[in-house]
Amino acid sequence: MIEVRSVTKRFGKGSRSVEVLHDIDFSVGTGQIAAVIGQSGAGKTTLSRIISLLERPSEGRILLDGTDVSGLSERRLRDQRRAIGTIFQASSLLARRTAAENVALPLEFAGVGRSERRARVAELLGRVGLSDKADLYPRQLSGGQRQRVGIARSLALAPKVLVSDEATSGLDPNTTRSILALLRELRDDLGLTIVLITHEMDVVRQVADVVTVLDAGRVVESGPVIELLRDPHSELGVGLLPDRSHITAEDRDVLWHVTYGSDTVPTNWIELLGKATGRSIGVLSGTVESVGGRPAGRVTISVAGEHPSVGDLLSSWGLHGTRVDDDASARTTEEAAA
């Protein structure tokens, strides 16, 4: 659906030019929710404007459904923009327009007739759960309600793609969860492809299918969220499910960092490990969650004394284990079994 190919973006000319994106590559499939994550200054907003066709890349291409849109004329670019809806951080509603009038704005610009506009606005406000707020002004709405109006407005022209630029930033956790649930529902009901620009790990973990990490304008990690969560060497995976506490254990205990690596990990694997090794197993810390209906987790365990089969046993149950040695070096289950 969306392909970003070797995109570079510079602002300014000659010796004064500043490169804010460098050779960016990633793709988003139809119906996927993709997150682009990074700290302030990473280039996220510039990338979102390029995907939204509000900026042209200095180099590289943007493809929508296989069509290269980065080199289109301004007229054709305006037509293509109708296929992309954008949700902004502060909802960007017009203060002197009611919720319904804000949602109607893109339809007015597109020349849609009054009766058709009214029907479409009513439909959209109902879809985002604000049918009873149609005549209220932005100042009369909560932050979450204003963002829902912004989402309804972004859907006015029936786009195929939604680009959300920090749409949940500044919202409280409960409101954030409700907005993300709404976006997931819209994806499922309308077949939308959604790109989430965010700096929040929780947003990625809750709704994203794939994620791309930007740092100083470069891609440093990219892939399906569940695969990164299950990769014991993924920095993003550790950030999404952190479990690296400074833990003290008994002198004879051997510590293992364990990462879930498959859909078939037994729920009682700790009990099974204790029985198979004849050792006492302690859980020192951990996080286990369902991500997109699939298990993901990172757990630190202690094993009472040495046992040569711990690594192999963990692997047989779909787990990646990293033994933490006394000198703070570590070896994976594959190394331990070699």
Swiss-Prot record:
It is a peripheral membrane protein. InterPro entries: AAA+_ATPase, ABC_transporter-like_ATP-bd, ABC_transporter-like_CS, MetN_ABC_transporter-like, P-loop_NTPase. It is found in: Cell membrane. GO terms for cellular component: plasma membrane. Its EC number is 7.4.2.11. One of its GO terms (molecular function) is ATP hydrolysis activity. Keywords: Amino-acid transport, ATP-binding, Cell membrane, Membrane, Nucleotide-binding, Translocase, Transport. Residues 2-241 form the ABC transporter domain. It catalyses: L-methionine(out) + ATP + H2O = L-methionine(in) + ADP + phosphate + H(+); D-methionine(out) + ATP + H2O = D-methionine(in) + ADP + phosphate + H(+). Gene3D superfamilies: P-loop containing nucleotide triphosphate hydrolases. The keyword Membrane applies. Its main location: membrane. The keyword Translocase applies. PROSITE patterns: ABC_TRANSPORTER_1, ABC_TRANSPORTER_2, METN. ATP binds at G38, Q39, S40, G41, A42, G43, K44, T45. Belongs to the ABC transporter superfamily. Methionine importer (TC 3.A.1.24) family. Part of the ABC transporter complex MetNIQ involved in methionine import. Responsible for energy coupling to the transport system. PANTHER family: AMINO ACID IMPORT ATP-BINDING PROTEIN, METHIONINE IMPORT ATP-BINDING PROTEIN METN. The complex is composed of two ATP-binding proteins (MetN), two transmembrane proteins (MetI) and a solute-binding protein (MetQ). This is Methionine import ATP-binding protein MetN 1. It comes from Rhodococcus jostii (strain RHA1).
